[in-house]
Amino acid sequence: WRKGQHTRHAQCVGVDAGIENPQRHLHQHTTLAVNSDTKGKLVDETYHFTGQHISEYDRTKAVAHDIANKFIAKELPLVVVMPGGIYGPGDTSTLRVNILDFLKGRLPMLPSQFGICLAHVEDTARGHLLAMEKGKPGESYIIAGEPHTMVDVFKLASQITGKRAPLTVPY
């Protein structure tokens, strides 16, 4: 599959399966991938990043989001959810790896300005269910908590564990 085309294929499945008049479809992105680097500016669901993406993953998620918007324009009852950095049981994210490295003393430094809005996996699942039950087709919903820098996250981890927080470097 060409990058980003999974969205087109997934949205066509319901039509091909003969599902008539579904109340809503659900499409998930992440806040990081869709919004890319906002240069520290807090944004809401209406924000659309138009600059150069910070990674290929980021770019292809934006392509998929554009495809989802085309389905919305064709009046497919699509609801978009955008979780923040998901954490919790079963976590395989970079954040988890960084925390484990920190606990083992193998995380020497952090970018000083990198921020993230975290979302616990149970809250994320609940947000998906609410979007399916009550979400307005054509709308997007961010599922995330307050923004934190990675420095904030690891200062808290340092306070909890008693381990020295990693050094920070400009980002």
List each model region and its residues.
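Conserved Rossmann-fold NAD(P)-dependent oxidoreductase catalytic core, especially the SDR/UDP-sugar
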Residues: W1-Y57
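Conserved beta-loop-beta element that borders a ligand/cofactor-binding pocket
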Residues: H29, D66-P89
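Mid/C-terminal beta-alpha module of Rossmann-like enzyme folds, strongest
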Residues: G127-Y171
